[in-house]
C-alpha cells in the first residue's frame, strides 16, 4: 500500500479498532496520522509556546488553521506561515504557487481578507544550474499566484547554502484583516450541519501529506505535487468572504484532502460523506483517491441546512462547482460512503489522537577553541560583502505586484520590515527571520536569536512586536542529533517569546528535509513577527554628514557568522542577551518618535560591515574609527564582522542625544563615524576601501545570475 506508518502505529490502530482496517481506511489513517498533519513528533513541545495574552483571539492552544489577535477598534489580524518544500523540489513553479494558494485559503478560512504575503526562500549554491532553475521557477510560481489573486508580496528572505542543494525551502506567510466578531472557526460544535464542498477534485496531489512526511528519494512522482489555478483561487477567495456570515465553519482542503479536513472539522463529533456527490475533475476516479486527493482551490464549509441554497448560489453565479457532500453527525465516527456502502468507518478520536513520539536526542552543541582571527582586512571586506546573502533582492521584488490593493506603505527592500496600512488607520509591520548557520552551531541560542532579530527589525521602522508564528524545518526527527537541535531551538524560541511577551499563535513543523542519501538540511527554524507602529514610521534615508552611531556592545562572537562560514573561522556562537535586544530596540523606537534619526539598521548577517555597506549603496561613503567601537576585542576584522545581538547602526544629526538616551536605558552607544559624499568608499581608520565593484554586484547579481539563467 506504500504507507508511511510505523509498525507500532499500525498495531496501535488495530488494537483501538479491534479489527484490521481495510485498504482505504489505511490510506485515510496514513494521511491523518502523517507527520505533516498530526505533528506527532512535535506537538508536545509546541504547547510550551502558549502565552496567555488578552490580545489573543485564536492561539496555538486552539489548534486551528491560523492565529488571530486583537489590534483594537474592533479589528483583528489573522496570521499564518506555511511551506511547500518537497513539492517545490520536484515542480518548483507549482510547488511554490500552491504554497501561496494554500496559505491564502487558511487566512480566508477565518473569514479574513488577505492583505499581505511574505516569501522566505532558501536554495543551494547558484553555481549549480539546477539551483538557478529552481529559484527562477519558485519566484515565478509565487508571482503568478500572488499577482493573479491580488494579494501583495511585501517582503521576505532569500539566502543560499549548499545544504539546500537538493532541498529548497519555500516558506510563505500571510496576514489577513477581519472584524474580530466575524472570525470563523475551522471546527464545529454541533451536529446536523451540512458539509458543502466548493471546487473540483482531481488526481493531482495524491498522497501529498505522506509525501511531505518522508525524505526525498529521487523517485517521487510529480503527481504528488498539486497544480495551481490562481483564477479559481480568486473565485474561492471572493466568494468565501461573501458567504462567511452564512456558514458556521470553514476549512481549506490542504494536506490529506477530505480525509483530514472532514476529520479535523468534526472536532470530536462525526461525519458522513457521500463520495459520489463530490464534483470530479477526472471521470471515474477511484473513491480512495477522491478521499485523499489534494487538488487545490477547494474549500469545505459547515452550513445550516437553511443556508445551503444561498451558499451554493453564490458559487453558481461564477459557474464554480458547489455540492452538499455530507453532514456532521453526533455519532463520533468518520464515514465515507460510496452509493450507500461504507468504505471508511473510523472513530473520530482515534484519527485525531495518533500515537505521540519522543525520539532519542544527542547533544551536538559545539565547544570551539577560540583563536585570534588573522585575515587581511581588504580582501575580507570584499569577499564577505560580495556574498549572495547580502545582495539586493530588488530583482525578486520586481517580479511581484507589491502595491496591489494600495495597502503597502513601505515597499520591499526599503526598510528592515514590511509595513502595511490597516482599516483602523494603524500601521502594521511584519518581518521574517531565520539563521541556519547559527542554528548549526547552537540551536538554543539560535532560537532566541531569531526572535530577537525579528523584534529588532520591527523596531527599525518604529514598531513593537506583538504576535508571531514559527516555522520549524529540520531533517528526520528519528535521528538523535536532528531531534536535539529541534528541541533546543524550541527551547530558545519559547524563552525569547516569553521574555518579549509575544504570543506565538500558530506555526508549522516540517521534518524530513533530507536528500536521497539521508543528509539533513541545516536546522532552519523561522520566525514571522508582526507589530503595530508605535507612533511615527521611519522610512530610511541617508543624508550627507550624518553621524554614524553604533548602538550596543560588540563581542568576539563569530560562530555561525557569515565570516565564519566563508573563512571557516573557529569561534563560539553569540550568546543572545535578550535584555540588551529589548532595551536597544526601545532606544530606536524612542528616537524615531522624537525624529532624532533618519536611518536604522539592526546588525545581523555580515555584522557591522554589512550594515555600513547598507548605507553606502544609497550612493554615499562612510568613514569610521574602529577605536570608537565599544567591544571586548581590538581586532578590526572581529569588530567589523561579529554578529553579536542587541546592536543597531543608526544615522543621526544629534548623536549626543542618542548616547544619552542609550545611557538612560542602560545600553552603550558610541559615535563611530560620519556619512560623506565619497561615493562607494568605506573609510576605516583613515584607510579608503573602494567598494564600487561590490556595489555593482549588490545591484546586479541576481538579475545576472537568475534573470539570464
From Swiss-Prot:
Mg(2+) 2 binds at residues 106, 252. Pfam families: AIRS, AIRS_C, FGAR-AT_linker. ATP binds at residues 39, 80, 470, 507. Substrate binds at residues 83-86, 105, 226, 294-296, 510. Keywords: ATP-binding, Cytoplasm, Ligase, Magnesium, Metal-binding, Nucleotide-binding, Purine biosynthesis. Its main location: cytoplasm. The active site is at 36, 84 (proton acceptor). GO terms for cellular component: cytoplasm. One of its GO terms (biological process) is 'de novo' IMP biosynthetic process. Its EC number is 6.3.5.3. InterPro entries: PRibForGlyAmidine_synth_PurL, PurL_linker, PurM-like_C_dom, PurM-like_C_sf, PurM-like_N, PurM-like_N_sf. It is found in: Cytoplasm. GO terms for molecular function: ATP binding; magnesium ion binding; phosphoribosylformylglycinamidine synthase activity. Belongs to the FGAMS family. Monomer. Part of the FGAM synthase complex composed of 1 PurL, 1 PurQ and 2 PurS subunits. This is Phosphoribosylformylglycinamidine synthase subunit PurL. The gene is purL.
Amino acid at each position: 500500500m506504500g504507507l508511511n506508518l510505523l509498525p507500532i502505529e499500525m498495531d496501535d490502530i488495530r488494537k483501538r479498532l479491534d479489527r484490521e482496517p481495510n485498504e482505504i481506511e489505511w490510506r485515510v489513517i496514513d494521511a491523518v496520522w502523517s507527520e505533516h498533519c498530526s505533528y506527532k513528533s512535535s506537538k508536545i513541545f509546541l504547547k510550551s509556546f502558549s502565552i496567555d495574552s488578552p490580545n489573543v483571539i485564536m492561539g496555538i492552544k486552539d489548534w486551528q488553521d491560523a492565529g488571530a489577535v486583537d489590534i483594537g477598534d474592533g479589528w483583528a489580524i489573522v496570521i499564518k506561515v506555511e511551506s511547500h518544500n518537497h513539492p517545490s523540489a520536484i515542480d518548483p513553479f507549482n510547488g511554490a504557487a500552491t504554497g501561496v494558494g494554500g496559505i491564502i485559503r487558511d487566512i480566508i478560512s477565518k473569514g479574513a481578507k488577505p492583505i499581505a504575503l511574505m516569501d522566505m526562500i532558501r536554495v543551494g549554491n547558484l553555481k549549480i544550474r539546477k539551483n538557478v532553475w529552481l529559484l527562477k521557477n519558485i519566484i515565478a510560481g509565487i508571482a503568478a499566484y500572488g499577482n493573479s489573486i491580488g494579494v501583495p508580496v511585501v517582503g521576505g528572505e532569500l539566502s543560499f547554502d549548499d545544504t539546500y542543494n537538493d532541498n529548497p525551502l519555500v516558506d510563505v506567510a500571510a496576514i489577513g484583516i477581519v472584524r474580530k466578531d466575524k472570525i470563523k472557526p475551522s471546527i464545529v460544535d454541533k451536529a446536523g450541519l451540512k458539509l458543502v464542498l466548493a471546487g473540483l477534485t482531481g488526481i493531482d496531489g495524491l498522497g501529498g501529506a505522506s509525501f511531505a512526511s518522508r525524505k526525498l528519494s529521487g523517485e517521487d512522482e510529480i503527481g504528488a505535487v498539486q497544480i495551481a489555478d490562481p483564477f479559481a483561487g480568486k473565485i474561492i477567495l471572493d466568494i468565501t468572504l461573501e458567504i462567511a456570515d452564512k456558514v458556521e465553519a470553514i476549512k481549506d482542503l490542504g494536506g490529506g484532502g477530505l480525509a483530514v479536513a472532514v476529520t479535523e472539522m468534526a472536532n470530536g463529533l462525526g461525519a458522513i460523506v457521500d463520495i459520489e456527490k463530490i464534483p470530479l475533475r477526472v471521470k471515474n476516479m477511484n473513491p480512495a483517491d477522491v478521499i485523499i486527493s489534494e487538488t487545490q482551490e477547494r474549500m469545505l464549509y459547515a452550513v445550516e441546512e437553511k443556508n445551503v441554497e444561498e451558499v451554493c448560489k453564490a458559487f453558481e453565479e461564477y459557474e464554480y462547482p458547489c455540492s452538499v457532500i455530507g453532514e456532521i453527525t453526533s455519532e463520533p465516527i468518520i464515514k465515507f460512503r460510496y452509493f450507500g456502502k461504507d468504505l471508511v468507518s473510523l472513530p473520530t478520536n482515534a484519527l485525531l489522537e495518533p500515537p505521540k513520539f519522543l525520539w532519542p536526542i544527542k547533544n551536538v552543541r559545539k565547544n570551539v577553541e577560540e583563536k585570534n582571527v588573522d585575515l587581511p582586512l581588504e580582501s575580507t571586506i570584499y569577499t564577505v560583502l560580495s556574498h549572495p546573502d547580502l545582495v539586493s533582492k530588488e530583482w525578486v521584488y520586481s517580479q511581484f505586484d507589491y502595491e496591489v490593493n494600495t495597502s503597502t506603505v513601505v515597499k520591499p527592500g526599503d526598510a528592515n520590515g514590511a509595513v502595511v496600512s490597516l482599516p483602523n488607520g494603524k500601521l502594521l509591520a511584519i518581518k521574517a527571520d531565520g539563521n541556519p548557520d547559527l542554528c548549526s552551531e547552537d540551536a538554543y541560542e539560535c532560537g532566541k536569536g531569531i526572535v530577537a532579530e525579528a523584534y529588532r527589525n520591527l523596531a527599525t521602522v518604529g514598531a513593537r512586536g506583538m504576535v508571531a508564528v514559527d516555522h520549524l524545518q529540520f531533517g528526520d526527527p528519528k535521528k538523535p542529533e536532528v531531534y536535539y537541535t529541534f528541541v533546543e531551538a524550541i527551547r530558545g524560541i519559547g524563552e525569547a517569546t516569553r521574555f518579549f511577551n509575544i504570543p506565538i499563535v500558530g506555526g508549522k513543523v516540517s521534518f524530513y528535509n533530507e536528500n536521497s542519501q539521508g543528509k539533513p538540511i541545516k536546522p532552519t527554524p523561522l520566525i514571522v513577527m508582526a507589530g503595530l507602529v508605535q507612533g511615527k514610521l521611519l522610512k530610511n534615508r541617508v543624508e550627507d554628514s550624518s553621524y554614524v552611531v553604533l548602538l550596543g556592545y560588540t563581542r568576539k562572537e563569530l560562530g555561525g557568522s557569515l565570516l565564519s562560514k566563508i573563512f571557516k573561522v573557529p569561534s563560539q556562537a553569540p550568546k543572545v542577551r535578550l535584555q540588551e535586544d529589548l532595551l536597544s530596540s526601545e532606544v530606536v523606537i524612542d528616537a524615531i518618535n522624537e525624529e532624532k534619526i533618519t536611518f536604522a539598521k539592526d546588525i545581523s548577517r555580515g555584522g557591522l560591515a554589512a550594515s555600513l555597506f547598507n548605507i553606502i549603496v544609497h550612493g554615499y561613503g562612510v568613514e569610521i574609527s574602529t577605536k570608537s567601537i565599544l567591544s571586548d576585542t581590538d581586532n578590526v576584522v572581529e569588530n567589523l564582522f561579529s554578529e553579536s545581538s542587541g546592536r543597531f547602526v543608526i544615522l543621526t544629526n544629534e548623536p549626543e542625544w542618542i548616547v544619552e538616551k542609550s545611557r538612560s536605558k542602560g545600553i552603550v552607544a558610541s559615535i563611530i563615524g560620519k556619512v560623506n559624499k565619497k561615493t562607494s568608499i568605506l573609510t576605516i581608520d583613515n584607510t579608503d576601501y573602494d567598494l564600487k565593484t561590490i556595489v555593482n554586484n549588490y545591484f546586479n547579481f541576481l538579475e545576472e545570475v537568475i534573470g539570464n539563467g
